[in-house]
Structure formats: structure tokens, C-alpha cells
């Protein structure tokens, strides 16, 4: 399971980004594998099972899927709990905002995973209005990359903007989560 998690956070993560229109350079890909190889090592995964590149990661994922059973009831419960977090989080003040976030996340799941997996995980299919969201995200990514990937300085600006956005999300979670909040 740890190998599958490792592969999910490296190979499958990058495939999802590409599906959302993000161009990943070979240097960035190498960096992601290096990061997750180190994390896998710290988690105790034997080094021989830690892929250094896409080819080896694909082989590992294929090997893992041949010995792993289909998703079970526990997998569906985990998916349900992850989606429920959208409704339980305290970042958004109003219920309708949290429901909107849930629908957007469901639409991304249906875009990134195939129909069989979504059904097996019992992820509700989003309403048609929400199914356009991943297409908007993809288009936005493609446009921003055309603007910011022209040269190194523009690329650095894009990286810095992304970093600031991530820090804002983290700050929002910290600011809006009550100190005594428990799931």
C-alpha cells in the first residue's frame, strides 16, 4: 500500500496535472520523483521499490495493480470522508459555499478518474453545470502557461504566484479552524 501511495503522489499526481493542462518539464518531473523517493525512504519503503523515473514508476504501478484487489467498502468510506470534509470545513461561513466546494471537487474527481473508479468509490456524479469546471481549470492553465512560460522570469513569477496562493489557503485554514475543532 505504501508503494501505491508513493506512486500516487508522484506518477499519478503528474498525470492529473497534465490532464488539467499543466506542462511539466523533465527537470520538474525528475524533481517530483526525487522528492517522493526521499519521502518514501523516510516512510520505510525499501529503496529497490522507489522509482526514480516515469518508466520505473509505471512498471511499479502496473505490478501493484496486478496484486491488489479492487477497491472495497473501505475505499468508498475513505472517498466519502474526503468529500464530507468539504461540508465540515470551517473556511467558508455559509453552507451553500461548502456545498459548492463539494460539487466542484466531485466534478474534478469525475474528470481525473474514469467512470468505473468513480462508481466503485461511490462518488456522486456532478450535475452538468459543475462538469464544466474542470474544463475551465484546464483552459485557464493552458492560457496562463502561454503567458508565463515564455521565459524564465515569467516562469518564476508564475511559481511565486502559486506559492502565495498556497500560503493563503493554508492561512485561511489556520485562521478559520476553531482551536477546539474536531471531526
Where are these regions (language model features)?
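Mature, function-bearing regions of proteins
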Residues: 1-183
